[in-house]
Amino acid sequence: MQLNTRQARIFKLANLLGTGKPVSAADIITSLECSEPTLTRALKELRESYSAEIKYSKAGHSYHLVNPGQLDKKTLRRMNEALAQNAELKTGESTGKVVLDKDKKTAVSLSLRMRILRKIDRLAALSGSTRSEAVEKLALHSVDELIKEYSAKKS
């Protein structure tokens, strides 16, 4: 099962605090790669979801799991296994790039006879595309042909 970012963060936090020793806030933030407000939300979720009692020490600027609630050794082990599986899934994923850039298009106004417009609409219907896509295909094909024709005449 693949974990979402929030789940992975909470599982990591549970494992960090599961040792029973105080853990500094800086170490937790570094390990979870998150901000202080995000850490606060993750601690709240851990307290609420697992009935865990987590104390904050101002002197040491650290957190300590005082009462684990439902975070017993078995639950922590399962969380650790889920994190390991999640890490394996992430390394196995393809690292191909996705390009989300669109071709830059410019709106063009054309004055066409109805006969030509009906032919363009028919081409769009036959090719399963929009009128704009049909005009683009038509223009691309025709312009390429005309360029070849005029290039041949000049040579």
UniProtKB/Swiss-Prot annotation:
Entry GO MF terms: DNA binding
Organism, scientific name: Escherichia coli
Gene Ontology biological process terms, A to Z: response to tellurium ion
Keywords: DNA-binding, Plasmid, Tellurium resistance, Transcription, Transcription regulation
Protein purpose: Involved in tellurite resistance. TerW binds specifically to the potential promoter region of the terZABCDE operon and probably regulates expression of the genes.
Protein name per Swiss-Prot or TrEMBL: Probable tellurium resistance transcriptional regulator TerW
Domain of life: Bacteria
InterPro entries: TerW, WH-like_DNA-bd_sf
Expression induction or repression: Expression is not influenced by the presence of potassium tellurite or hydrogen peroxide.
Taxon lineage: Bacteria, Pseudomonadati, Pseudomonadota, Gammaproteobacteria, Enterobacterales
